Amino acid sequence: MAAGPAPPPGRPRAQMPHLRKMERVVVSMQDPDQGVKMRSQRLLVTVIPHAVTGSDVVQWLAQKFCVSEEEALHLGAVLVQHGYIYPLRDPRSLMLRPDETPYRFQTPYFWTSTLRPAAELDYAIYLAKKNIRKRGTLVDYEKDCYDRLHKKINHAWDLVLMQAREQLRAAKQRSKGDRLVIACQEQTYWLVNRPPPGAPDVLEQGPGRGSCAASRVLMTKSADFHKREIEYFRKALGRTRVKSSVCLEAYLSFCGQRGPHDPLVSGCLPSNPWISDNDAYWVMNAPTVAAPTKLRVERWGFSFRELLEDPVGRAHFMDFLGKEFSGENLSFWEACEELRYGAQAQVPTLVDAVYEQFLAPGAAHWVNIDSRTMEQTLEGLRQPHRYVLDDAQLHIYMLMKKDSYPRFLKSDMYKALLAEAGIPLEMKRRVFPFTWRPRHSSPSPALLPTPVEPTAACGPGGGDGVA
């Protein structure tokens, strides 16, 4: 039962190179001569053909790639988690057990790279079909998804139910073994593409994990890739270069601005806590402090990023935006940061909350976003993930950076903060100098006096030759 990785025409392949590598492994595992041994497996009264055991999969991977059994088990578990191998006895548990548990290879039609992205309409048909077959006894998270999709695509729900009933009617004409196999295949596909709450999303991609390298690999042998490369180098040749004197001047300006704020270069005030055993420096520079130091307030003027990374500076900036009736911009940026770094199980809830509070028509804290960015954001909300609001967040960030941030630096509030900020006094080391031990009690070998050899005129008793 060999399978080829070619997707059906008209469906673009996902730019995810690790999926291509796993597909090549799965294809080699199904080789009739050198692949994993397949046999018919009996489940109760049903016989499932072309099944493999978990121990055979681990043994084949260990022999094929010359790795230990532990590494082979991990590789097999990754294949199961990505839906290329699915269990027959417990389809909801995507785990590889190195025993006689029966598994089966996923058909190429349900490979993630073939059907990506997964459409909401297909998921609604799957849930409707499962709801009819089980007479409403869905899992809790599937019930929530079913209700949400019912509200979201209510205009096409008759089509969803009609498709579900037609598929169930066609399934009755198949054998019991085929029905079981197709049900396991569909369930595995949706467990990978719509994981339950709390389960890891193996297909999640961050902005840094984009398909830049993968697209280059796919385009290496094409003429379009070489045309793009020639155009890139032509633009690079015509680009104006910055003189070295200008670069050095910028480096000197940067170092001169940041030098007083570097504790290694300019020291710490009131004292270095690692030397003086006094934590006053840490107390004055705590994340939340009532009266920030002058150096800390000055750093807010270096860049907008410095202001946002400081909790105290962000709080004062929020007060300033509140006076200008634009505090919803910073609140939206903070909500996007919470979504980006929050728990995976809370991503759908956080996305809905941000949309209802900031982006929905008539929202309580509606933010001003251009129509193009709003369309891209609404398109991404159909399949929510932690990076779905990146475009809108960047738009609001640049709006605050170019408009609100310069006015904040010129405002009376920031000038008053600079005037009221204090400079810590240097702490004296000790009251009694004779009780103070120097940091380096032993002198450096380079500073030790060099011994002088006695001359011939000197006697053995001393340097003057007197016995």
Swiss-Prot record:
Residues in the signal sequence: none
GO cellular-component term (any): protein-containing complex
Keyword Ion transport annotated: no
Single GO MF annotation: G-protein beta-subunit binding
Residue intervals of the DEP domain: 32-107
Every G protein gamma domain range: 219-282
Segments for region (Disordered): 440-467
Annotated InterPro entries: DEP_dom, G-protein_gamma-like_dom, GGL_sf, RGS, RGS6/7/9/11, RGS6/7/9/11_DHEX_sf, RGS_DHEX, RGS_sf
GO terms (BP aspect): G protein-coupled receptor signaling pathway; intracellular signal transduction; negative regulation of signal transduction; regulation of G protein-coupled receptor signaling pathway
Top-rank taxon: Eukaryota
Domain RGS: residue ranges: 299-414
Alphabetically ordered keywords of this record: Signal transduction inhibitor
Function of the molecule: Inhibits signal transduction by increasing the GTPase activity of G protein alpha subunits thereby driving them into their inactive GDP-bound form.
Subunit structure of this chain's protein: Heterodimer with Gbeta5. Interacts with RGS7BP, leading to regulate the subcellular location of the heterodimer formed with Gbeta5.
Entry protein name: Regulator of G-protein signaling 11
Biological classification of the source: Eukaryota, Metazoa, Chordata, Craniata, Vertebrata
Gene: RGS11
